[in-house]
Design a protein with these regions (language model features):
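A generic, residue-level signal for flexible/boundary positions that often mark functional hotspots
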Residues: 6, 28, 232-234
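Residue-level signal for beta-strand positions within conserved beta-sheet cores that form or flank
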Residues: 10, 23, 156
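Serine-esterase "nucleophile elbow" of acetyl-processing enzymes
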Residues: 14-64, 69-85, 89, 224-226
């Protein structure tokens, strides 16, 4: 008991002085309709919650309907308006690439080349295969490469965090915008899992952390019981409502504890 009483004030003190690493920081958000402040599915977005809870100043450049090929434009606009003054960037996009049937593609193009090499013997030109990042704007992985090449060159000293797309069910806006659920392949024959896995792979290719919201936030619109987290049970289980955004925000708040915001 004496030991407990002696240790408890120390523990209490440690809790009192602890500060979330993203507290009071300036964060740019790139993405699509789930992040776009003009989307009416919710009054509050996940970044609004983070603003309230952590005092984050949000700079939001997300636009509804956009795909990975729009990230360079969003990055340019952010840099033009704020320069190097932001602390970090969060990128949450990809569901529209799936819906629009963008081909997955490859991460690299491979070529036969020669390189100078010597190990235990005199150096000499040696035939090797060499990979080059694929910059194909018509493929998903090519678009991610183009985007991250742009963002990491613009912001070499900033934290860049990727978020995987969340699960999606039907979205029925009108007869010309009638999107089916994720248990169907898209026009190019791919399930959404391939698009999610590609974001995870990009983390290793580009040395950026990824938060797997698809798994961690718990939103699963395929079940009627989870319709409560989305805009409309019958017509829109793609866009989270206020309750859904709060759940995303709570997940992010705890996941971001493991990442520095500024270096």
């Amino acid at each position: 008991m004496i030991a407990f009483l002696l240790l408890f004030p120390l523990a209490l003190s440690a809790q009192t002085v602890f500060q979330h690493p993203w507290q009071g920081k300036k964060v740019a958000y790139f993405g699509d309709s789930i992040t776009d402040p003009r989307n009416k599915a919710s009054k509050k977005k996940y970044w609004t919650c983070l603003q309230e809870w952590l005092g984050i100043t949000p700079y939001v450049y997300a636009v509804s309907g956009r795909q990975w090929d729009d990230i360079p434009r969003q990055a340019d606009k952010c840099y033009a308006e704020h320069g190097d003054s932001i602390d970090a960037i969060i990128i949450f996009i990809g569901t529209n690439d799936y819906n629009n049937g963008v081909k997955i593609g490859e991460w690299y193009d491979e070529k036969d080349e020669e390189v100078m090499y010597g190990h235990g013997q005199m150096k000499k030109m040696t035939p090797r295969k060499r990979q080059y990042l694929c910059m194909d704007k018509d493929t998903y992985r090519g678009r991610i490469n183009i985007a991250l090449d742009k963002v990491k060159r613009l912001y070499p000293e900033k934290q860049i965090v990727l978020l995987t797309p969340i699960h999606r069910q039907n979205f029925h806006a009108n007869d010309k915008n009638w999107q089916c659920s994720e248990d169907y392949t898209n026009q190019c024959g791919e399930y959404i899992e391939e698009y999610i896995e590609s974001v995870k792979e990009a983390a290793n290719i580009w040395a950026v952390p990824v938060i797997d919201l698809n798994a961690l936030c718990g939103l699963y619109p395929m079940m009627d019981e989870h319709a409560r987290y989305f805009n409309n049970a019958e017509t829109d289980r793609l866009h989270p409502n206020d309750l859904g955004h709060r759940r995303i925000a709570k997940t992010l708040m705890y996941q971001l504890l493991t990442l520095p915001c500024a270096f």
